Amino acid sequence: MFVPSYDVAGFIGNGYFMRDILYAEQLINELQNDEFSYPETVYMVNKVSQDFLIRPMGIFQLVDYVGIDVVQFIMSVMQPHVEKENIQSELIDIHLNNAVKGGQFADGTQKDGFFRYEKGKIEAIFDPGKKRYISVSEVSEKCDEYLGPLPEGWLPWKKLVHRPDKDELLKKYFSQLLASNSPGTVMAKSYLQRFKEIGSDLVKNKVAFKFDDVNAVLIYGFHHAYGPVNDYF
């Protein structure tokens, strides 16, 4: 699929992706202010962005997949062309300063990044303060309890994305999410609001021609089940 856009650094895809990373970093800082450890915050933000938002990957797993060094490079290319906005991530820089780069091996398996992987599954979280990986099992129980259960009607991305009744299922799911006030759903709602703002700003700031183009890049390029401009929320 061909999606046109204005000739702007980052275009639609990276224009969205880099800002999504920066918002995830903002959430991490807020959670650390609430006295959660760094590995706990990474676990929770990644879980909310994948499970509660029904995406194929959590935000930090996606950064690992692309490569932390690649993300830093994209941000450095975009920054001189973006006015009144800081496209730089201290979180990305800290990991690279610790020689943690993510990316993939030649056979497609995942290199260590924000997470360490075992047979494709997240097994541990890098803690820059301790300069080592912390097992997911050390943080998952506390974090899952804090976030609370997924809203009624939830389906994992893999089971939802190709369903012919996907639109109706998403409407019902987000109706349940919006009615909930657990910490996980509150975080998800703020994430969705920022998601929508990013998509709208890409049109407002003349990166994308129209909202449908932003949605197309997210759905067909990032394989999301829905775009940022929709009637679900």
Residue ranges and their predicted role:
Residues M1-F233:
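N-terminal glycine-rich phosphate-binding loop for ADP-containing cofactors
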